[in-house]
Amino acid sequence: MVNAAQRTRVKVEADNRPSVDTHPPGVQPSPGTGGTRHHNFMLCVVLAVPVFSLVLSGTALFTKQRRVSPDDGLITRPILIAVATGALLCFVEKLTDRAGSIC
């Protein structure tokens, strides 16, 4: 059976243990919810670009009233824009992670 003095000693020993830091030396943890907002903004941008491009290409299809051929590039252009935007945002995020959070 554990008495009160032993429980107090165990609690004091647990409080004196160093905290575990999962970040490498010199790297500061990201502040509160700022990182989540940054990632949500990037996700919105990455999803909005292809949708906007598809809308523009769709309106071009309806206004021209002509048959679409695979050589028009109307399907591949939004995908290319989305991939390029996603790659650019990932590159910018990597740079800001190295330099410290600016958002």
From Swiss-Prot:
Cellular localization per UniProt: Cell inner membrane
Entry's Gene Ontology cellular component terms: plasma membrane
Membrane topology: Multi-pass membrane protein
Chief localisation class: membrane
Transmembrane spans: 42-62, 73-93
Composition bias type Basic and acidic residues, residue spans: 10-20
Region (Disordered): 1-34
Keywords for this protein: Cell inner membrane, Cell membrane, Membrane, Transmembrane, Transmembrane helix
Residue runs in coiled coils: none
Miscellaneous notes: Encoded in the E14 prophage.
Protein name: Putative protein YmfH
